[in-house]
């Protein structure tokens, strides 16, 4: 009589991290940071997470391969890795060329009750109902279900967890859309020890962000820094010759005023961080950094409305473009002065 072989039937796996956290907020990256740091037992505001990560930046990209062809972006590079590098241990985005392997790696961390930050493209998140590519969007992943082929993630201002199919999850993480192509970027958030004192971290975070802005730093979108604000200011009058000048101006308005940037290109979110920092570190109060950043934020808010007005014209308005150029130069001068002062903080 032949022997009988009994094999194990592989059932679809399902996992949701207990006590997952999502506190809806303003900006994808800083919301994701606050969610995962809260999960690990630390009560930090979104503004504090943004500030520690050094979230301020400025990119200006001109290319016929992107839409719009003149694109600004007002957040700095590497905010999420910088945050963890300052509070815990050296951290960088990890990458994986194979999208199936990247998915399995994410599931393995979830199985260990460790949430994962990923970068994705908004176009592949159905709940946004967007046909526009926006790669680099950061969310936190808290669970998966093999039977329904679904992952569960927390995203910015949306309540609760969002269900995303494995197919869309993989496509979003591997999006090659310019100007920020992705390669399944992720950070597993495993804090194995108490984080550093914020009184030590905050001054270092301030100086780091200031140096990045003065010296310039390269990220997935190119170079970020105050020099790019000057370049943008010089080029604004030339927008009249861009075939998509309306979209250039409208997109600029949106990324400064509307797209999760706290109304002023993240400058008011950073102001709120500075206000908290001044409460914790009394010597900072005398420098009036939060008040100075509030004024810079006002200038960014006003700039956004000029861009909006430009976008609503029937044809390029040379006077408005010249005004926008002048205001961008003022921003360059104000930000340069601010960061140079911060670098000198002892």
Regions found by a protein language model. Name each.
Residues 13-44, 54-194:
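Conserved active-site-adjacent core of cysteine acyl-enzyme catalytic domains
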Residues 23, 70, 93-96, 189, ...:
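Charge-dense, low-complexity intrinsically disordered segments
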Residues 38-47, 274-281:
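Short helix-capping/linker segments at secondary-structure and domain boundaries
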Residues 146-262:
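Noncatalytic regulatory segments and standalone regulatory/sensor domains
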Residues 254-346:
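Charged, long alpha-helical assembly modules
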